[in-house]
Amino acid sequence: MTKGGIRIKAYKLLRKKKDGLLYPLFIHKQYSTPIGEWMQAECYPTKGFSVRTGWHCCFQPLAPHLKMKLSSGEERVWVECEVEDWESYDRPESQGGSWILAQRMKIIRELSDDEVIQLKAEYYGFA
């Protein structure tokens, strides 16, 4: 695990509901996450999930183990965010590699599908 005290750019996968608001995928998922506001991480133990307090983010918009479109019609979108008071958490490449667990996060903007494709191409050296 690596700790980071500086503010960095990160990416987070969220649910976008019909109301246009953004929501976490699994933990505390009934509460929307506003754009442009700093949010403090809180601990919400949830059955079936390991307790890892912090906003779960990525260094790149990569989460190959998660689907973007579900049969339920749920839409998932990537957002660019800033995080503070974070640490990296090593995960297998099949889960996107290292995750970021941040104590503070601010969503900057939603990324378009084209932006996500471009960022992945740059990450894999195809751009």
What annotation goes with each model-predicted range?
Residues M1-R52, M68-E75, E87-D90:
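ADP-ribose/NAD+-binding catalytic cleft of ART/PARP-like enzymes
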Residues A41-E115:
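ADP-ribosyltransferase catalytic core
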Residues L111-A127:
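Peripheral, non-AAA+ core regions of ATP-driven protein-machinery
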